[in-house]
């Protein structure tokens, strides 16, 4: 890469990350909306009675609840989920197609694993009818197996309050799909009108169980008002965050997402907080509703526990693919991700797919590279005359600038011609950076030889060092327009970049290395072309 391009990249990186750090987008705590009806149900001609306060069941000791609860395992081709009759909640979810390490004998990724009943996820609250997370439900099955492509299967949990209110919590599973449908069906068999606002409580450890890299992202995520908000765990200590009418809310790390997705406005608010037990809690509250005697209503959600794969998330709908934050250059990063998958179908190696994409990008940008290099050559030839002008008008800056501009016009040289074409490529670089840095496709994907995880760093630092050497070669080949001091500063760049890339994903380093090698080949060809043209 030319020196000007390197300067542009560094300045862009500083601006890109510095601006985000210094001027983060304001996060307003949204007020809770007025209760609205987002439920469906029968409307019998029952008289409108006043809402009755339903007494809460007598508290049951935690040890007794744990002894009475029963676990139900659900097996699908993609995951194993274990539910508890306590709250009809989820106690464990293991992804069958993903492991914690690149080693095939490593443990499968576990998104939910709670042995403490007070920390079960997807537990349910509804104060108006006396339902709390410790309530014991009755399950419709002792176990469930869903095969790939098989018809949907249901697992229902039923609870009846002392006042005669029946709550059915129904989960629907489908083979080959990470999405789970969840519906609350409520029927009032009592004699008084009751009101309730169901709360689904998701819990997550405040510290990630597995941190795959120093660049790991982790914490609550909420999509509301067409905007993704990612909260930092440290910002939730001592205070929570509330969101009005979000489309979905949950927890995410670099590669996986756990979320509750609203259906037909079924989420009134989502409130996230850090608990004294060292857990994160996301309380999803449905719009408040009331039921007359003999009336029934339902409220629906869509659950997702799975990988942050662009295609899989998009197939789920509800803008769930926005959980993959590709930054300012998402419009470029998404096509690059699709291209990566496209070439993988044919070569079955993501490392080779990265090389193919790099070659294609080099071909696309060749006219710009040629124009940039040619302009730099012309500027290099003008250096002696420009130096004469500077000496002649060293005491008159206005006259010197005028003379230099006349020199440019006479020789038809654009002073920024060597830089602007390269600046056009900067957005593509950042888009590819985002695509490769956060692509689950590269996670544990082998390339060849010692590189067995393209999402992890090069274990022996071979590729970053070779990359640094190629940068030195590029600098030697690039026409110089700098004074000795500037040249010394530029010579330090390969060292800086080498150390910076030591802990970068090897897939990203591979791209940069191949790009450098192709640039060296390009420069050699352009040098010969220009020399041949001048010899004629």
From Swiss-Prot:
GO biological process: protein insertion into membrane; protein transport
Cysteine disulfide links: none
GO cellular component: plasma membrane
UniProt-annotated location(s): Cell inner membrane
Membrane topology: Multi-pass membrane protein
Subunit structure: Interacts with the Sec translocase complex via SecD. Specifically interacts with transmembrane segments of nascent integral membrane proteins during membrane integration.
Functional description taken from the UniProt entry: Required for the insertion and/or proper folding and/or complex formation of integral membrane proteins into the membrane. Involved in integration of membrane proteins that insert both dependently and independently of the Sec translocase complex, as well as at least some lipoproteins. Aids folding of multispanning membrane proteins.
The protein's name: Membrane protein insertase YidC
Species whose genome carries this gene: Geobacter metallireducens (strain ATCC 53774 / DSM 7210 / GS-15)
């Amino acid at each position: 890469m030319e020196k000007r391009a390197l300067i542009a990249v560094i300045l862009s990186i500083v601006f890109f990350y510095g601006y985000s750090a210094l001027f983060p987008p304001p996060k307003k705590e949204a007020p809770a909306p007025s209760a609205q009806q987002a439920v469906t149900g029968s409307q019998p001609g029952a008289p409108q009675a006043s809402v009755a306060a339903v007494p809460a069941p007598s508290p049951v000791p935690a040890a007794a609840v744990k002894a009475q609860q029963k676990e139900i395992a659900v097996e699908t081709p993609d995951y194993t989920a274990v539910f508890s009759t306590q709250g009809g909640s989820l106690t464990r979810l293991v992804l069958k197609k993903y492991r914690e390490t690149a080693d095939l004998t490593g443990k499968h990724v576990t998104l939910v694993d709670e042995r403490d009943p007070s920390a079960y996820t997807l537990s349910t609250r509804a104060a108006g009818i006396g339902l709390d997370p410790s309530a014991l439900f009755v399950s419709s099955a002792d176990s469930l197996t869903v095969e790939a492509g098989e018809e949907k299967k249901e697992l229902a949990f039923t609870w009846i309050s002392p006042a005669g209110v029946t709550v059915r919590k129904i989960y629907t599973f489908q083979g080959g799909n990470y999405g789970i449908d969840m519906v609350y069906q409520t029927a009032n068999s009592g004699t008084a009108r009751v009101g309730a606002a169901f709360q689904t409580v998701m819990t997550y450890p405040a510290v990630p169980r597995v941190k795959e890299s120093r660049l790991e992202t982790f914490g609550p995520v909420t999509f509301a008002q067409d905007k993704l908000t990612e909260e930092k765990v440290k910002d939730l200590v001592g205070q929570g965050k509330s969101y009005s009418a979000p489309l979905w809310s949950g927890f995410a790390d670099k590669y996986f997402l756990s979320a509750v997705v609203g259906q037909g406005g079924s989420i009134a608010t989502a409130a996230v907080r850090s608990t004294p037990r060292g857990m994160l809690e996301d309380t999803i509250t449905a719009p408040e509703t009331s039921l007359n005697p003999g009336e029934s209503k339902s409220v629906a959600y869509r659950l997702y526990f799975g990988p942050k794969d662009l295609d899989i998330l998009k197939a789920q709908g509800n803008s769930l693919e926005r959980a993959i934050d590709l930054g300012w250059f998402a419009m470029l990063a998404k096509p690059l991700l699709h291209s990566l998958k496209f070439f993988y179908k044919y070569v079955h190696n993501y490392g080779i797919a990265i090389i193919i994409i790099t070659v294609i990008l080099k071909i696309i940008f060749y006219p710009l590279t040629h124009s940039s290099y040619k302009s730099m050559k012309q500027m290099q030839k003008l250096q002696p005359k420009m130096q004469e002008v500077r000496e002649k008008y060293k005491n008159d800056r206005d006259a010197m600038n005028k003379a230099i501009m006349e020199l440019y016009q006479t020789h038809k040289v654009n002073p920024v011609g060597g830089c602007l074409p390269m600046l056009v490529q900067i957005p593509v670089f950042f888009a590819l950076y985002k695509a490769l840095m956060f692509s689950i496709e590269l996670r544990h994907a082998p390339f060849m030889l010692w590189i067995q995880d393209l999402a992890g760093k090069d274990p022996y630092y071979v590729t970053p060092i070779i990359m640094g050497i190629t940068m030195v070669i590029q600098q030697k080949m690039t026409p110089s327009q700098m004074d000795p001091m500037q040249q010394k500063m530029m010579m330090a760049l390969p060292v800086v970049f080498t150390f910076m890339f030591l802990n970068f994903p090897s897939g990203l380093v591979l791209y940069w290395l191949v790009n450098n090698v192709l640039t060296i080949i390009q420069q050699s060809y352009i040098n010969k072309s220009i020399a041949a043209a001048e010899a004629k």
